Amino acid sequence: MKLIVITTPQFFEGEAEAVTSLFQNGLEMLHLRKPGASAEEMGNFLQQLPMEYMPRIVTHEQFQLASVFGLKGIHLNGRNPQIPSGYKGHVSRSCHSLEEVLKHKSDCNYVFLSPIYDSISKEGYSSAYSCDTLQKAQQAGIICLLYTSDAAD
């Protein structure tokens, strides 16, 4: 099993300490997702983390920080949909349809597909995929399910 955490959209007091603790206790990868954060804010946050964890962090914003801090890579999304010119590192992407997965998965190390579950933070943002749809997409080789449960039926 891989433990991957996506940060909350806003910085919070004690976040660097919490992230450090997560890494110390088995976190494999952190997706640093701070929409609207400046390069300075993101850099200040990264400077609070031990350097040994930088190669396990993927940034969703301020892609130039990937090379400055030696981050694992970048994550493409609706706000930042293009790989920067000349970038050769790790790339992941958010996809919101199986068609998007098919279009982008060959250009990425991996993709996130959502919404799989009803959102607890976005009102009215409901699951877009039945278990059957996901299983068929897996059988067709479109996606790789990391976790399935019959309890969801």
Show where each model-derived region lies.
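Glycine-rich tight-turn/loop motif centered on a GG-T
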Residues: 38-39, 123-128
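A general structural signal for well-ordered alpha-helical segments in protein cores
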Residues: 42, 46, 113, 130-134
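A short acidic, helix-capping loop that chelates divalent metal ions and anchors anionic groups
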Residues: 117-123
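Short, conserved loop/helix-junction motifs that constitute active-site signature segments
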Residues: 85-87
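Non-cysteine beta-strand/loop elements that form the S-adenosyl-L-methionine
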Residues: 109-117
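Alpha-helix-loop-beta-strand connector modules within alpha/beta enzyme cores
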Residues: 49-56, 92-94, 128-145
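Conserved small/polar residues in nucleotide/adenosyl-binding loops
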Residues: 147-153
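Conserved N-terminal beta1-alpha1 strand-loop-helix module at the mouth
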Residues: 1-75, 79-81, 91-108
